[in-house]
UniProtKB/Swiss-Prot annotation:
Keywords: Aminoacyl-tRNA synthetase, ATP-binding, Cytoplasm, Ligase, Nucleotide-binding, Protein biosynthesis, RNA-binding. It catalyses: tRNA(Tyr) + L-tyrosine + ATP = L-tyrosyl-tRNA(Tyr) + AMP + diphosphate + H(+). ATP binds at K242. It comes from the Bacteria. L-tyrosine binds at Y42, Y179, Q183. A motif ('HIGH' region) lies at residues 47-56. InterPro entries: aa-tRNA-synth_Ic, Rossmann-like_a/b/a_fold, S4_RNA-bd_sf, Tyr-tRNA-ligase, Tyr-tRNA-ligase_bac-type, Tyr-tRNA-ligase_bac_1. It is an enzyme of class 6 (ligase). Its main location: cytoplasm. Its EC number is 6.1.1.1. This is Tyrosine--tRNA ligase. Belongs to the class-I aminoacyl-tRNA synthetase family. TyrS type 1 subfamily.
Length: 421
């Protein structure tokens, strides 16, 4: 399959048209495998945080498209590899997590996937596995003899994840050095257990994935394939999935639905078309129409992107509520009940009212009262859409009971509420 010949399989055609495809070890062979049906592919997710964030969405969407085009997705939880730590893209060693932390993170991450793929026992139903099941059962000497002998240290030292650390005189532990061996073994084990033929991942995983293909060949498995997606950045070059306030989590408990909706609504104009292709299932002709909008009209495309992307993660009803909240807040100027809220107890509020500096700090809109003072001097803080000019102002308990909307700039809002009873 050359660049001039479109893929014959629905799976690779969709990945190509929508911008998911970066590298593939054997495009023609994989295309034929996908076209014939029954393609089984996996992506691994280490348990380094309590949930996944937007930076993982490209990989999750690839699993979703695989299932929608007749393939079987495997979600591999890295219960074992998380204990080792992936050095890819890292300047220093990852923090070593306890087994309890890894297990807690794994449970949080698991919840994300049922929103994107269907799990079950059917031919195309998704499967979830955990590499701790086989990695923790390995005997060290046996692993060295049976598996380790197939790895070339010369080649391992040439991998970007290793080479960059060494060139910068940054420490790379023996533990991390073994990560690619574990990931390669995962691929072979998943092929042996489930007939998995393809490993997908971000472009930073190319070396590790290809190492798995090579290990499989040396250990006598059938043909295996690698496919990676491009490193996702915004049009201005910022890393996807992070904002000034932190990660854009896919878990409502870690990031309110409204904030998630706002993240997509606030994307750059140049990113709208690309994000619609990657993070929604809108038809390409509709995306082309939205992408062509100019000036103020592009904001309508951003609202559609925000609602569709939010519906994918949090459901259609929650996405529509977030869109309605934004409309009321920004276009109608009313206090929307579904804004992110901070609930205060009556005993937290002095008799004379809550100081404005403390209120913004409690709301999490500023990190300190001194930052609140600076924002007031710059005209950046508002109470119920009115600019705050007096740093000694207070919000009465009655105002909080009615719902006091605090705003930082034009796009960050929190509603202060009084606890019931």
């Amino acid at each position: 399959m050359s660049k001039d010949i479109p893929p014959a399989s629905d799976f690779l055609a969709i990945l190509t048209e929508r911008g998911f495809l970066h590298q593939c070890s054997d495009p023609a062979g994989l295309d034929e495998k996908a076209k014939s049906g029954g393609l089984i592919a996996y992506i691994g997710f280490d348990c380094t945080a309590p949930s996944l964030h937007v930076g993982s969405l490209v990989q999750i969407m690839m699993l979703r498209w695989l299932q929608k085009t007749g393939g079987k997705p495997i979600v591999l939880m890295g219960g074992g590899t998380t204990r080792v730590g992936d050095p890819s893209g890292k300047d220093e060693s990852r923090k070593i997590l306890t087994l309890e932390e890894i297990e807690a993170n794994k449970q949080g991450i698991k919840q994300v996937f049922s929103k994107f793929v269907h799990f079950g026992e059917g031919k195309t139903d998704a499967l979830m596995a955990d590499n701790a099941e086989w990695l923790t059962a390995l005997h060290y000497i046996d692993f060295l003899r049976d598996v380790g002998r197939h790895f070339s240290v010369n080649r391992m030292l040439s991998m970007d994840s290793v080479k960059l650390r060494l060139e910068r005189d940054q420490e790379l532990s023996f533990l991390e050095f073994n990560y690619m061996c574990c990931q390669a073994y995962d691929f072979v084990e998943l092929h042996k257990r489930y007939g998995c033929q393809l490993q997908m991942g971000g472009s930073d995983q190319w070396g590790n994935i290809v190492t798995g293909i090579d290990l499989g060949r040396r250990m006598g498995t059938a043909q295996l394939y690698a496919l990676t997606s491009p490193l996702l950045t915004t049009a201005s070059g910022a890393k996807m999935g992070k904002t000034a306030k932190g990660a854009v989590w896919l878990d409502e408990a870690m990031l309110p639905v409204f904030d998630y909706w706002q993240f997509w609504r606030n994307c750059e104009d140049r990113d709208v078309g690309r994000f619609l292709k990657l993070f929604t299932e809108l038809p390409l002709d509709e995306i082309a129409r939205l992408e062509a909008l100019q000036d103020a009209e592009i904001n309508e495309a951003k609202k559609i992107l925000a609602t569709e992307a939010t519906a994918m993660v949090h459901g259609r009803e929650a996405a529509e509520r977030a869109a309605d909240t934004a409309r009321q807040t920004f276009e109608e100027g009313v206090v929307a009940a579904s804004l992110p809220s901070v609930i205060l107890q009556t005993n937290e509020i002095p008799a004379e009212g809550l100081g404005i500096l403390a209120a913004f700090a409690k709301a999490g809109l500023v990190n300190s009262t001194s930052e609140a003072r600076r924002q007031i001097k710059g005209g950046g803080l508002r109470l119920n859409d009115q600019p705050i000019t007096d740093e000694k102002a207070v919000i009465t308990i009655e105002a909080i009971e009615a719902g006091a909307k605090l705003s930082l700039g034009r796009k960050k809002h929190v509603l202060l509420r009084l606890a019931d009873g």
